[in-house]
Amino acid sequence: GVILDWVPAHFPRDTFGLSAFDGTCLYEHFDPRQGSHPHWGTLIYNYGRPEVKNFLIANALFWAKEYHADGIRMDAVASMLYLDYGKQDGEWVANIYGGNENLEAIEFLKHLNSIFKKEFPDALLIAEESTAWPKVTGELDDEGLGFDYKWNMGWMNDFTEYMKNDPIYRGAHHDQLTFSMVYAYSEKFMLSLSHDEVVHLKGSMYTKMPGTPEQKMANLRLAYAYQMVHPGKKLLFMGQEFGQEKEWNEKQSLSWELLEDKEHLQLKNYMAALHAFYKANPALYQLDEKPEGFEWINGMEWEKNLLIFLRRTRKKEDTLLVICNFSNVEYDDFRIGVPYPGKYKEMFNSDAESYGGTGVGNPRVKMSKKTECDERKNSITVKLAPLSVQVFSYTKPETGAASNKSAKAKTAAKAAAEKKTGKKGKPAGKTEEAVKAVKAKKTTKTAQKAEKKVSEKTVKTAEKKQGTTT
């Protein structure tokens, strides 16, 4: 699909554009406190004018109708919602109620989203909104703005800052990992590692990672896997999937030659496998917007840099146990509490050798034991790879009733087999008495044959003696 980055928040001052279009402030406000954005040096649309609103709405519909865009990501929505965004005292004008909310822009966004959804119900509307404005993805009839998703700027900033730290120091910043789950269900969020994070001397995702080249790759595999197992929809900026080393420059092509290196090719293949795993497991996306789709097992292991949690659907058998190790330490026989007794099998490991990792993992299925851990009655012991995400599937054990049923089935099957073939090679359908009768009959015949032979021998001997006497 194609999602357009659409900017209804402001426009440049270039005189060949919309600025002073007919020699007057046609699209912008006349008052610079309302029509100028000092933070970016741009002009702000006058959302109070019907002509301006119609122009913008028609433009959005044009992209969807004529170019079949699958969605629109609206840039800088926060700057539209607040009259004082990026401004100092005296640089902005309050609304009719004396507040800093831009009432005209709010009404414009609601109107736009309402019309757009009627025309293109399957297209996505995404807001890049960086504040705590309520109900950005709320329904229009519930005083919401009507967007499908909100860019999770908080997660993006916190997570990238956390990953920049050497694993030795990550424990002190553990809250940057866990805080996103405090507000994860307040909106319908989209997790994006976008162009904003790889421009303006911020470096690429690869250069943000600490350590040696091998550790950078391990950190990238960890980061992308964590993004996939975290609640919310996902977006990754181009080039980061194979470890682009330079930061993004719109005037240059991506460094495709990096794919000639084994490590970068392995990362690309890893991303393909990660996406396939995501699509194959509904627990990673089905209840993204519902609290019941996520459950902490242990989110407080800050000293070990560990996060352990569950992803769920409404089916118990779809449950996934996720273990994220943000340290560069390998843990042997690490005990973890599990939600149910049963079997746990490692289904995905970001540190697999095929992806360029160390290969530390759990090839054998783990059977839970009744040993309390993490405030749960059952637990398993696993081997944790350094800088990794490991995901385990769950299979319920056979219950007592099921075991008895299985045993009865085996007994019945055995009896049927004996009835068909006969026990210990006996003819099928023969009773014990019948078998004895057959044996007795054989014995009688043998005795009769022996008796006949003895009689014949006696007669011959007698005849021989009589001939000799004569």
Regions of interest found by a model, annotated:
Residues 1-100:
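Substrate-binding/active-site clefts of carbohydrate-active enzymes
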Residues 34, 44, 60, 177-179, ...:
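Hydrophobic alpha-helical segments, principally membrane-spanning helices and signal/leader peptides
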Residues 42, 210, 377:
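Short, flexible active-site loop motifs that bind/organize anionic cofactors or intermediates
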Residues 49-52, 56, 97-105, 212, ...:
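Residue-level preference for long, well-ordered alpha-helices that form the structural scaffold
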Residues 52, 56-63, 108, 112, ...:
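Alpha-helical packing segments of well-folded alpha/beta enzyme cores
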Residues 68-70, 85-251, 279-351, 358-359:
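Conserved alpha/beta catalytic core and glycan-binding cleft of carbohydrate-active enzymes
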Residues 78, 131, 396:
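Flexible, active-site-proximal loop/turn residues at the rims of small-molecule/cofactor binding pockets
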Residues 171, 214-217, 226-236, 240-470:
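Carbohydrate-interacting/catalytic domains
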